[in-house]
């Protein structure tokens, strides 16, 4: 009898993606984050769906509706805590997934990498509009500060900002459209993730050594299905520990106060996963310059494949590049810390130095290290 999973039009796609897919035999736990991101996306869509049943996107009732979800809806507090902290887990997995791609040279699969960068931007947009929805103080002022950056665009800036707001300031129209965006974007993310997977399966996975693994492949199931299941169990455990024991530890206390346009919080800052970009934005005294640096901090990922100078794909056997990679990691942690600090010395100068180092590492030092490693590997006799 012919196996149904190999002949049925729909089952065949699933089979070729998750069952009979030939996978390198040596991929480490750093390759788990793709499936974990998929799990995060499903968790966020499901919890978000149940939250949307009870949420009202009106400035007068949004804050109260979130309180109602937590107080009166069956397990509403749990659904909301999983959704809020699920976003943090999502970004944690995203950053590790991108870091893995940079370390092991996965960015040389250019189409997969570029779709990945577009996915990152889309997830960031989704998280931003989602943070505005509870209509607390930090929701309102975060939306005001970030959307105001559009006004830095020459000539059309003010018109563009007012068009996004749907008025002359962040108000009811803004909240309503942000809810609409927050509802539709996860489905766009799902579609992009499938395209991401499509391009990945054109080439097959990279592996820690960076060498072509075609000579040694194993089936995805059962080896990597069980490995992914373990990863998902640990992810779920961490998410539940966070959501049940300290659900508000990553949030801002200001967001427990309803939005008030007449009272500005002393320190306006986004969620932790945006702080590195926020620090780069603030490190430039000029408004337009800051916006351009903010965009560049993410879009620089698109040119990483063009800056690959080394003869070896992976950093596994390149100690100088490894050192620079971990300096970049430490630098991003420093930027995240600075983004959460007030705008005063010594934080200003630390932020400016860290911002310069961020671009210097990616655009100059890492390509130079690749060239130097090539030179060192050449026989000298």
From Swiss-Prot:
Cofactor: heme b
Predominant location category: mitochondrion
Note describing how the cofactor binds: Binds 2 heme b groups non-covalently.
Residues annotated to bind heme b b566: 97, 196
Function recorded in the entry: Component of the ubiquinol-cytochrome c reductase complex (complex III or cytochrome b-c1 complex) that is part of the mitochondrial respiratory chain. The b-c1 complex mediates electron transfer from ubiquinol to cytochrome c. Contributes to the generation of a proton gradient across the mitochondrial membrane that is then used for ATP synthesis.
Residues spanning the membrane: 33-53, 77-98, 113-133, 178-198, 226-246, 288-308, 320-340, 347-367
Single annotated GO MF: ubiquinol-cytochrome-c reductase activity
CDD domains from the UniProt entry: cytochrome_b_C, Cytochrome_b_N
Binding site for heme b b562: 83, 182
GO cellular component, one term: respiratory chain complex III
Membrane topology recorded in Swiss-Prot or TrEMBL: Multi-pass membrane protein
Alphabetized UniProt keyword annotations: Electron transport, Heme, Iron, Membrane, Metal-binding, Mitochondrion, Mitochondrion inner membrane, Respiratory chain, Transmembrane, Transmembrane helix, Transport, Ubiquinone
Keyword Transport attributed: yes
Organism: Murexechinus melanurus (Black-tailed dasyure)
Binding residues annotated for a ubiquinone, in chain numbering: 201
Gene that produces this protein: MT-CYB
Protein name according to UniProt: Cytochrome b
Note: Heme 1 (or BL or b562) is low-potential and absorbs at about 562 nm, and heme 2 (or BH or b566) is high-potential and absorbs at about 566 nm.
Annotated localization: Mitochondrion inner membrane
